[in-house]
UniProtKB/Swiss-Prot annotation:
Residues 344-358 form a propeptide. It holds the Pfam family Photo_RC. The D1/D2 heterodimer binds P680, chlorophylls that are the primary electron donor of PSII, and subsequent electron acceptors. It shares a non-heme iron and each subunit binds pheophytin, quinone, additional chlorophylls, carotenoids and lipids. D1 provides most of the ligands for the Mn4-Ca-O5 cluster of the oxygen-evolving complex (OEC). There is also a Cl(-1) ion associated with D1 and D2, which is required for oxygen evolution. The PSII complex binds additional chlorophylls, carotenoids and specific lipids. Photosystem II (PSII) is a light-driven water:plastoquinone oxidoreductase that uses light energy to abstract electrons from H(2)O, generating O(2) and a proton gradient subsequently used for ATP formation. It consists of a core antenna complex that captures photons, and an electron transfer chain that converts photonic excitation into a charge separation. The D1/D2 (PsbA/PsbD) reaction center heterodimer binds P680, the primary electron donor of PSII as well as several subsequent electron acceptors. The gene is psbA3. It is an enzyme of class 1 (oxidoreductase). Tyr-160 forms a radical intermediate that is referred to as redox-active TyrZ, YZ or Y-Z. Pheophytin a binds at Y125. It catalyses: 2 a plastoquinone + 4 hnu + 2 H2O = 2 a plastoquinol + O2. [CaMn4O5] cluster binds at D169, E188, H331, E332, D341, A343. This is Photosystem II protein D1 2. The record marks H189 as: Stabilizes free radical intermediate. The keyword Iron applies.
Length: 358
């Protein structure tokens, strides 16, 4: 009987595979990391160069370039990587599609380069979270939670431009550009009156409240292991089996502060709730952006209440509508003479009275 003896020497490819998937590395790489690292590096390098030195971009496609970089007079607040031109629309616009590098810069090519590499990179980051959890035998909920901010980024950088028909409608990569995107989004889609946005606000602010409540309750019910002269933090040893705080005391305090059933008596269900609340809220916001991308907008109650003489009784909805029109006439002011809402025919008010029959 012959026995096949495998050579003890490892090939370079096998050594590389072992290194990539080794969970003992200081920072886990993983196969998703092989995709993530170059994509995020490319996005970061291009963003940094463009934010500092990119020439003005013809964002509206009307030969009126908008400057966004620092060396063209902006500061950290006003600077941005300007979205690609409306003349490009939804066309894929890599460097080799332009006649020259100057043309690529003029039409906002860096915006597409940054966004596409960034979206691939953060998607791979989510895959890397799952991959590391799988190799360590953990449950997969970390990457599920991360899918909420990932879906939000996908909504504003990919889905919304697709729905509107041009990457020039994507969110600019800067602080004031983000605020401009929010104002224009409200003007065109009435997002404040969309239920999914309301759920997102509840998720973000509720998550902040619950996080602060949980942290303060735990910190206030620590089991003292030190003297008064020492910090309580020294009473905890990493990996210790004993509870570091008294959950019964925290439960009793909060149950008496609100009422008994407002307080969790199960640590696992408590932490699931803390994770699920903001995640579900941000999921809803992403779905709201994605539906409004195709102009399924927020509720519109403009001029919906009339008196017996048919005169409009203004409500908060009418105040909001006037603010929307003001924001709409101010943006892209040279790209069109009138915003669509003002150029359209007079709208028929919805009255709160039954029509006359016969």
């Amino acid at each position: 009987m012959s026995t096949a003896i495998r050579s003890g020497r490892q090939s370079n490819w096998e050594a590389f595979c072992q290194w990539v998937t080794d969970t003992n590395n200081r920072i886990y790489v993983g196969w998703f990391g092989v995709l993530m690292i170059p994509c995020l590096l490319a996005a970061t390098i291009c963003f940094t160069i463009a934010f500092i030195a990119a020439p003005p971009v013809d964002i509206d496609g009307i030969r009126e370039p908008v400057a966004g970089s620092l060396i063209y007079g902006n500061n950290i607040i006003s600077g941005a990587v300007i979205p690609s031109s409306n003349a490009i629309g939804l066309h894929f616009y890599p460097i080799w599609e332009a006649a020259s590098l100057d043309e690529w810069l003029y039409n906002g090519g860096p915006y597409q380069l940054v966004c596409f590499h960034f979206l691939i990179g953060i998607s791979a980051y989510m895959g890397r979270q799952w991959e590391l959890s799988y190799r360590l035998g953990m449950r997969p909920w970390i990457c599920v939670a991360y899918s909420a901010p990932l879906s939000a980024a996908m909504a504003v950088f990919l889905v919304y431009p697709f729905g509107q028909g041009s990457f020039s409608d994507g969110m600019p990569l800067g602080i004031s550009g983000t605020f401009n995107f929010m104002l224009v989004f409200q003007a065109e889609h009435n997002i404040l009156m969309h239920p999914f946005h309301m759920l997102g606000v509840a998720g973000v602010f509720g998550g902040s409240l619950f996080s602060a409540m949980h942290g303060s309750l735990v910190t206030s019910s620590l089991v003292r292991e030190t003297t008064e002269a020492e910090s309580q933090n020294y009473g905890y040893k990493f990996g210790q089996e004993e509870e570091t705080y008294n959950i019964v005391a925290a439960h009793g305090y909060f149950g008496r502060l609100i009422f008994q059933y407002a307080s969790f008596n199960n640590s696992r269900s408590l932490h699931f709730f803390l994770g699920a609340w903001p995640v579900v809220g941000i999921w809803f916001t992403s779905m709201g952006i994605s539906t409004m991308a195709f102009n399924l907008n927020g509720f519109n109650f403009n001029q919906s209440i009339l008196d017996s003489q048919g005169r409009v009784l203004n409500t908060w909805a009418d105040v909001l509508n006037r603010a929307n029109l003001g924001m709409e006439v101010q943006h892209e002011r040279n790209a069109h003479n009138f915003p669509l809402d003002l150029a359209a025919a007079e709208s028929t008010p919805v009255a709160l009275q039954a029509p006359a029959i016969g």
